[in-house]
Amino acid sequence: MKFNELKSFPVECRQSSMGCAKDCERKWLCQYRLGIKLRGGEYKEAATLGQIYHRLQCLGPGHEVEVRAEVRKQQTALMAGVERGEDLDGNMSRLASNLTMLYQKAEVMAHVFWKKFPQPEYFTTLGMEIKHSVEWQDGLFITGTLDKLLILSPSYDAWIRDHKSTGRPLSALFGGLSWSLQGRIYRILAEDYIRTVVGSMNNPVKGFILDGIITPGIKLCKADEKNAKEWKCSVETAYLRRVEEWYVSYEVKAEFDNKANTKALDSKAMLFTEPLYP
């Protein structure tokens, strides 16, 4: 296919495309308007860790085996690409070799978060990882993925819940929560999804819950094997215990240093008080 034969995709207003356009307009044109992607793969450790963590959070406790199987399947697909000669810059083999480590870290992050912020029983899950698109003015599409859509009992109000992991202080996540663009876009998507897909007019979207957790700076290593023998537990349990201690020490050190945000994980809710449309 020749370059002049490519057909452009409709403009989508979504977080990833807007971020790409801000960083590099040429990449945005190729990837999001023309559908051109580089052969091979990109090595983005934080993004891959976040994807695995998101998957664990969406499925919830008890589904670790399922997510682990998905990671193994991804590893197999990456190595198959390497054998076909698609690994032009070595990123595919690098990612495949590090996926196990990233899964181990994501799993302990999820367990630490579930322990401190379990989902309340008065919430029921209407949907998970909901991909939805709304056609806006002049052919503009608002698109996004809702991590979770929850129904509050007994009022039947709907709440959006989003999970984020970061290497920065949580103040970078929660600082602009009340006026964030993401919360407004997700509100539009959630209301349209409930009305057009669920077919309900009795579940008004009341608010946005944002969960944040800082990525731990340690990974499973020989120290956990040594601790497992000493504590008479599995290596995974020893690693979980060491990560829990890391989170405690992070918050203690942040408080000692008089930092503005001393928390390593948090969950905050924003109630929608303004009408969606003027």
Residue spans of the language-model regions?
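Residue-level recognition of the N-termini of beta-strands and the immediately preceding loop/turn
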Residues: 124-126, 158, 203-208
